[in-house]
């Protein structure tokens, strides 16, 4: 395989270019070799294909010659069929690893097994499982106590086993490490399993005379061997077992009470650890991926809230929605606003539509009708904005008409009828109150005309203003209210007759 060497950072430019050039040349050489090999292989394949074609042609010619021959071909069987090869005996040995070796050494050529993993890279001969299982030092020990076992031996190691338990490690390799090798003794706290009991004193035939232990001491020391079938490990292993005792595939032990002493079951371990190249565990599942570990991650069924159906009262209750606040009113010029029509909301749609744009401003009021001059007045002037009560407008109109001498004025009583629309500017309606007052009083000595003329009214108004300023107010009866009210439009005196 071609590997491209990396160029260091501190390499110069020339060195970098040189290394890149060397790498490219090497890549070309490797590519040429690969193409040459592929071409050579293709040539070999073509040669094999041509040989097959030639063999096929020969077979076709033989078939054609057989079809054209007139002879009858018969096949005769021998009197006895050839003997079937004997089936190889069922192997009772452990796993054979070096199966491709030409020579399998015998047991006399192998050194004695001092450790359980001495046979990992050597072939094994047929052995007696019962004998091997009874040997406590046959199987691989846990990694936690392997070093101690090699140094101090089996007796001191057995005392350490019964001295106390250790805390469970965070990441055990497999379930076999949870127990001591060859026994059902848990190696950690809170671990147990469905294993058969096995005496620790197998080397001294289970007797108490050699070990010097009493029955109470042995019972206390073997507390770690007792099975706890209701533990988490055993219940997890059996929770998915769908085969009960009545199932035809269920395993049953034909145990006879009469042959209780002679019957002996072969006990097989569930795992054979430290066998490189083979599975560690064939029956038990890894506790790291067991389903009981997922209970802390997945939500439980009772914690999932269920959707409750609404009651009749809730279903009949009207749905209320919160409307957005109305937009602020727009400031418009003071003008008569049209009356707002009430809107009845019968049902609010589920989707709130955006607020409607504000209504357009009302049209401006129509201009006032054009002023028509009255037939009774011969003086016309354009109205201006009154600032001092109308006196300046009146004096300007008099000056524009050529003075008071040229004004053609007449009394109100001389015209019984007044036709035309009231425009609020006629002199006759403006001097109505002043013309009625001198009827009952004597004419002013300085008046230049009759009691109802314009100049006399002006002179009286000026005298009254002057007296009011000086504080000399004469007690006069108040004028009628009707005299101060201007006539309505289209007024006709005939209606009052």
From Swiss-Prot:
GO terms for molecular function: actin binding; alpha-tubulin binding; gamma-tubulin binding. Residues 323-339, 351-372 have a biased composition (Pro residues). InterPro entries: WASH1, WASH1_WAHD. The keyword Amino-acid biosynthesis does not apply. Residues 390-412 form the WH2 domain. Disruption phenotype: RNAi-mediated knockdown positively modulates lifespan; effect abolished in hsf-1 mutant background. Increases resistance to both heat and oxidative stresses. Increases localization to the nucleus and also DNA binding activity of heat-shock transcription factor hsf-1 after heat shock. Increases in transcript levels of heat shock protein genes sim-1, hsp-70, hsp-16.2 and F44E5.5 after heat shock, but not in unstressed conditions. May also moderately decrease levels of post-translationally modified hsf-1 under heat stressed conditions. This is WASH complex subunit homolog 1. It comes from Caenorhabditis elegans.
């Amino acid at each position: 395989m071609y590997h491209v060497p990396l160029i260091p950072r501190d390499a110069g430019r020339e060195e970098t270019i040189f290394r890149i050039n060397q790498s490219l040349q090497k890549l070309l050489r490797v590519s040429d070799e690969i193409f040459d090999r592929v071409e050579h292989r293709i040539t070999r394949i073509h040669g094999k294909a041509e040989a097959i074609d030639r063999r096929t042609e020969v077979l076709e010619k033989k078939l054609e010659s057989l079809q054209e021959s007139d002879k009858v071909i018969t096949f005769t069987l021998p009197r006895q069929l050839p003997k079937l090869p004997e089936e190889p005996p069922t192997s009772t040995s452990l796993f054979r690893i070096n199966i491709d070796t030409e020579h399998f050494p015998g047991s006399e050529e192998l050194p004695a097994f001092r450790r359980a993993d001495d046979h990992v890279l050597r072939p094994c001969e047929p052995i007696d499982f019962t004998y091997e299982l009874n040997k406590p030092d046959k199987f691989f020990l846990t990694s936690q106590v392997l070093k101690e076992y090699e140094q101090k031996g089996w007796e001191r190691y057995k005392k350490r086993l019964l001295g106390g338990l250790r805390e469970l490690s965070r990441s055990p390799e497999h379930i076999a490490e949870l127990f001591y090798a060859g026994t059902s003794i848990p190696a950690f706290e809170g671990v147990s399993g469905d294993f058969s009991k096995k005496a620790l004193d197998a080397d001294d035939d289970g007797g108490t005379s050699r070990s010097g232990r009493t029955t109470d001491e042995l019972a206390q020391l073997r507390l770690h061997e007792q099975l706890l079938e209701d533990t988490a490990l055993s219940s997890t292993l059996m929770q998915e077992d769908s085969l009960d005792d009545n199932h035809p595939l269920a395993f049953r032990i034909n145990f006879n009470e009469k042959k209780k002493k002679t019957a002996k079951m072969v006990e097989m371990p569930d795992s054979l650890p430290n066998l490189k190249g083979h599975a560690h565990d064939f029956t038990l599942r890894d506790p790291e991926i067991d389903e009981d570990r997922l209970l802390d991650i997945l939500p439980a069924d009772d914690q999932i809230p269920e959707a409750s159906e609404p009651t009749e009262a809730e279903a009949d209750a009207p749905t209320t929605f919160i409307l957005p606040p109305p937009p602020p009113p727009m400031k418009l010029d003071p003008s008569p606003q049209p009356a707002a029509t009430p809107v009845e909301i019968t049902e609010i749609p589920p989707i709130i539509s955006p607020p409607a744009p504000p209504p357009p401003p009302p049209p401006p009021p129509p201009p006032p009708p054009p002023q028509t001059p009255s037939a009774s007045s011969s003086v016309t002037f354009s109205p201006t904005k009154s600032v001092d009560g109308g006196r300046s407008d009146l004096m300007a109109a008099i000056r524009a008409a050529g003075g008071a001498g040229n004004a053609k004025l007449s009394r109100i009583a001389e015209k019984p009828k007044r036709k035309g629309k009231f425009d609020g500017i006629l002199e006759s309606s403006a001097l109505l109150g002043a013309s009625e007052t001198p009827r009952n009083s004597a004419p002013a000595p300085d008046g230049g005309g009759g009691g109802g003329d314009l100049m006399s009214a002006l002179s009286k108004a000026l005298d009254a203003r002057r007296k009011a300023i000086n504080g000399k107010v004469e007690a006069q009866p108040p004028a009628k209210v009707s005299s101060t009210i201007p006539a309505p439009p289209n007024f006709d005196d005939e209606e009052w007759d």
